[in-house]
Amino acid sequence: DVCSSDLSDGLAIAEKHGLPGIIKEFIVSHHGTTSTGYFLTQYLNDGGDPEDVAEFYYDGVKPVTKEQVVLMICDAVEAASRSLKDYSQQNISSLVDRIVDGKVREDQLSDADISIRDINRMKEVIKSYLMQMYHSRVSYPKRKENAKK
């Protein structure tokens, strides 16, 4: 089961290395109680029983701090951004909005002391960062050995 192994493996690694409790709290809250969207959708599209979907939901806890919310959002956006075929400003903006709005709709942020203003600011910062990260660069040509200096 992908969902439970992600959390249990993360906690086991944290225990093995003696990481503090606060790190373990981040591990169990970074997916909250969300579904594994890809696997759940694939299961349902393949004719899976909509009443038998518990294994497609993480058994973590909802984030309770702003920092845990930031990790949850950044983790989800980073993973989803890898699937983009076009890193245009519009596509990046739509992706970030869809993911953050989905977390709000799924009630994942309700236990955290975070304002709408904080959420909107986070969205803008993430969009800006992704645009910088994925902007294309000009390919610099190598100078030919016989080229004039």
Question: What are these regions, as identified by a protein language model?
Answer:
Residues 6-149:
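Terminal helices and disordered tails flanking the catalytic cores of nucleotide-processing hydrolases
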Residues 2-4:
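Short, small-residue-biased leader/transition segments that mark boundaries at the very start
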